[in-house]
Curated annotation (Swiss-Prot):
Its main location: membrane. Keywords: Calcium, Cell adhesion, Cell membrane, Cleavage on pair of basic residues, Glycoprotein, Membrane, Metal-binding, Phosphoprotein, Repeat, Signal, Transmembrane, Transmembrane helix. Pfam families: CADH_Y-type_LIR, Cadherin. GO terms for cellular component: adherens junction; catenin complex; plasma membrane. Residues 637-790 are cytoplasmic. Residues 25-53 form a propeptide. It is a single-pass type I membrane protein. PROSITE patterns: CADHERIN_1 (PS00232), CADHERIN_2 (PS50268). Residues 54-608 are extracellular. Three calcium ions are usually bound at the interface of each cadherin domain and rigidify the connections, imparting a strong curvature to the full-length ectodomain. This is Cadherin-18. One of its GO terms (molecular function) is cadherin binding. The keyword Repeat applies.
Length: 790
């Protein structure tokens, strides 16, 4: 099979030569070579030869972007087996077969049905095969060929980036590289000049230029000044076909900004300035601003201000505001119009960051003169000191002078000044001030231990202008006097072991004093000399504001005495010296041999009784509850009793029932059996409560040993003898007073009752001697007796 290619038409001569070569090759390839085959037929061996392929193939070319109405002819497939009778069928497979490329299966002509773009796909690989139309058997093996898309100049150059934004320092040398731009062309760079790009500048001359081959942009002028022009817009063109007429082109914009360098010194707008400052301006406050201009920007415009000379250098100072680049003039010392009315300052502003490449442009600093006018202001009174410190002793009398403050009018008028205290807190009311002289006095008695320090605020005002006020703080320290005696530092729980030895230290005590250190230490500890010498304990002053308690004798017994009391004296070193007395309580405890406490008297009692602390508390609570019940019961019983004496208006003939059994309290207490069991409890004599005894016996004093040794019989005899000789104990006779009926009683008279006694048995004259209570009874019975007599 042979392939003809009539599509190679550009240039024509080359295509004709190429077609002639193709046909020559096909002619020489028409020789068929048979493939060797071995076949056994009836014992004979038949040799077959494989014929040589009858294909002739090559590359086909097709123009891109074909816009004709008919399919574009690509080429022709032909096989040597094709006799022109239509028995050979051509089949085309591969990339684009049947869609982009179609084949006439009889003639082998190939056509392109679509417009192709080389930039999308440069070539197509296809497969061709010739088969027998009747049997569909291949006449020759399948062959592969390529269809290449022929390039045309249909793509303009394109810049990879853009628009571009770049910077270049101002005052740069001519030819300084700014940026390199690059444009690409999608056409085939190996075919003609379709992809050969040339650069040119359309806008931006004469400031910048571009290299036509590399696309490098450079400065075209020397010393371009940012302050004159800062921004430039440069348009660069890229054109293919080596820039020839008819070539395609693309463009981009490059925005170039000149960056600043320090090529301009600072300049003050004026050479002379004038500033007004009132004399009342506060020290440290800003009184004015000044600024020098710099055409540069950023750090190149940074500057510092300084005072280089002038008569106000010690009065004023200047600093630089880094944000606004202004010089801030501040006051270092107070102004006084009466002393100086104006000042002159020379102020300099200089760049901070210098560029030595431009030092030839001159010094990068400037100076100006500032005149300051001091304004007269009516000022408030001025105290002689910014604050005052005074001292006064505690317990000083009311009206004691503490100190004096002084304020004057600083103006030339020298107005009179008045003083007063701002009573903002309660502490200020301990003092007052003389409005004319400024003398501060006490109004209360001060106590250093309660308040050691006072702070008061004194205000001064002018009489002519009361609105002008000045304030000053007065600190008053209260000095200490020795008015507090020393006392024990705390309550001490001191114990002594039963097995203690003489001279043994059992405890160490210390003292405190509310007074100041100068009037407090040192403390002296001693025993009161007015008391007898304590035989059990002594006191030793350690001369370090402590004292030790020592034993005087050997061994102590809890059964004999379990608690001892030791009175001590403590004095301080103040002038005059003060002292106080205290009593130490010392308990006797049982200790181990190594000195550890085992039990004390309270613990021993509980342990011997077999009771714990919780059990003891429970017993006490039960006893208290029982006592409360008994008291409540007795109170209710007593509230139900009638009064012993009934008033005259409330006498009735009623039968009164008494529920008391036995004797009274005197009878029950006189024969209390506890007196026999504990004779010492009977030492106190019992007296009747309804009368006052006429004679009292002196109490008896007997030793406990005598009472313990006497027996019960002797004790009873002794008490019986005392009762017989004592007129103040029962039995004894006394006059008892009872209620009487009275004249207005609603009850009937008892005279209606007949007496069972005879006349000789009763004598009623004695009733008149019993008093007014029996007067009515005497009258009744006296009349009856007289009637009987008559």
């Amino acid at each position: 099979m042979k392939i003809t290619s009539t599509s190679c038409i550009c240039p024509v001569l080359v295509c004709l030569c190429f077609v002639q070569r193709c046909y020559g090759t096909a002619h020489h390839s028409s020789i068929k070579v048979m493939r060797n085959q071995t076949k056994h037929i009836e014992g004979e061996t038949e040799v077959h030869h494989r014929p040589k392929r009858g294909w002739v193939w090559n590359q086909f070319f097709v123009l891109e972007e074909h816009m004709g109405p008919d399919p574009q002819y690509v080429g022709k497939l032909h096989s040597n087996s094709d006799k022109g009778d239509g028995s050979v069928k051509y089949i085309l497979t591969g990339e684009g077969a049947g869609t982009i490329f179609i084949i006439d299966d009889t003639t082998g002509d190939i056509h392109s049905t679509k417009s192709l773009d080389r930039e999308q796909k440069t070539h197509y690989v296809l497969h061709a095969q010739a088969i027998d139309r009747r049997t569909n058997k291949p006449l020759e093996p399948e062959s592969e060929f390529i269809i290449k898309v022929q390039d045309i100049n249909d793509n303009a150059p394109k810049f990879t980036d853009g628009p571009y934004i770049v910077t270049v320092p101002e005052m740069s040398d001519m030819g300084t590289s700014v940026l390199q731009v690059t444009a690409t062309d999608a056409d085939d760079p190996t075919y003609g000049n379709s992809a050969r790009v040339v650069y040119s500048i359309l806008q931006g001359q004469p400031y910048f230029s571009v290299d036509p081959k590399t696309g490098v942009i450079r400065t075209a002028l020397h010393n371009m000044d940012r302050e004159a022009r800062e921004h430039y817009s440069v348009v660069i063109q890229a054109k293919d076909m080596a820039g020839q007429v008819g070539g395609l082109s693309g463009s981009t914009t490059v925005n170039i900004t000149l960056t600043d360098v320090n090529d301009n010194p600072p300049r003050f707008p004026q050479k002379h300035y004038q500033l007004y400052v009132p004399e009342s301006a506060q020290v440290g406050s800003a009184v004015g601003k000044i600024k020098a201009n710099d055409a540069d920007t950023g750090s190149n415009a940074d500057m510092t201000y300084s005072i280089i000379n002038g008569d106000g250098m010690g009065i004023f100072s200047i600093s630089t505001d880094k944000e606004t680049r202004e010089g801030i003039l501040s006051l270092k010392k107070p102004l006084n119009y009466e002393k100086k009315k104006s000042y002159t300052l020379n102020i300099e502003g200089a760049n901070t960051h210098l560029d030595f490449r431009f030092s030839h442009l001159g010094p990068f600093k400037d100076a100006t003169m500032l005149k300051i006018i001091v304004g007269d202001v009516d000022e408030p009174p001025l105290f002689s000191m910014p604050s005052y410190l005074m001292e006064v002793y505690e317990n000083a009398k009311i009206g004691t002078v503490v100190g004096t403050v002084l304020a004057q009018d600083p103006d030339s008028t020298n107005s009179l000044v008045r003083y007063f205290i701002n009573y903002n807190v309660e502490d200020d009311r301990f003092f007052n001030i003389d409005a004319n002289t400024g003398t501060i006095r006490t109004t209360k008695v001060l106590d250093r231990e309660e308040t050691p320090w006072y702070n008061i605020t004194v205000t001064a005002s002018e009489i002519d202008n009361p609105d002008l006020l000045s304030h000053v703080t007065v600190g008053i320290r209260v000095l200490d006097v020795n008015d507090n005696p020393p006392e024990l530092a705390r309550e001490y729980d001191i114990i002594v072991c039963e097995n203690s030895k003489p001279g043994q230290v059992i405890h160490t005590i210390s003292a405190t004093d509310k007074d100041d250190f100068a009037n407090g230490p040192r403390f002296n500890f001693f025993l009161d000399e007015r008391l007898p010498v304590n035989p059990n304990f002594t006191l030793k002053d350690n001369e370090d504001n402590t004292a030790s308690i020592l034993t005087r004798r050997r061994r102590f017994s809890r059964t004999v005495q379990d608690v001892y009391y030791l009175p001590i004296m403590i004095s301080d070193g103040g002038i005059p010296s003060l002292s106080s007395s205290s009593t130490l309580t010392i308990r006797v405890c049982a200790c181990e041999r190594d000195g550890r406490v085992r039990t004390c008297h309270a613990e021993a009692f509980l342990s011997s009784a077999g009771l714990s602390t919780g059990a003891l508390i429970a017993i006490l609570l039960c006893v208290l509850i029982l006592l409360a019940i008994v008291v409540l019961f007795i109170t209710l019983r007593r509230s139900k009793k009638e009064p012993l004496i009934i008033s005259e208006e409330d006498v009735r003939e009623n039968v009164v029932t008494y529920d008391d059994e036995g004797g009274g309290e005197e009878d029950t207490e006189a024969f209390d059996i506890t007196a026999l069991r504990n004779p010492s409890a009977a030492e106190e004599l019992k007296y009747r409560r309804d009368i006052r005894p006429e004679v009292k016996l002196t109490p008896r004093h007997q030793t406990s040993s005598t009472l313990e040794s006497i027996d019960v019989q002797e004790f009873i005899k002794q008490r019986l003898a005392e009762a017989d000789l004592d007129p103040s104990v029962p039995p004894y006779d006394s006059l008892q007073t009872y209620a009487y009926e009275g004249q207005r009683s609603e009850a009937g008279s008892i005279s209606s009752l007949d007496s069972a006694t005879t006349q000789s048995d009763q004598d009623y004259h004695y009733l008149g001697d019993w008093g007014p209570e029996f007067k009515k009874l005497a009258e009744l019975y006296g009349e009856i007796e007289s009637e009987r007599t008559t």
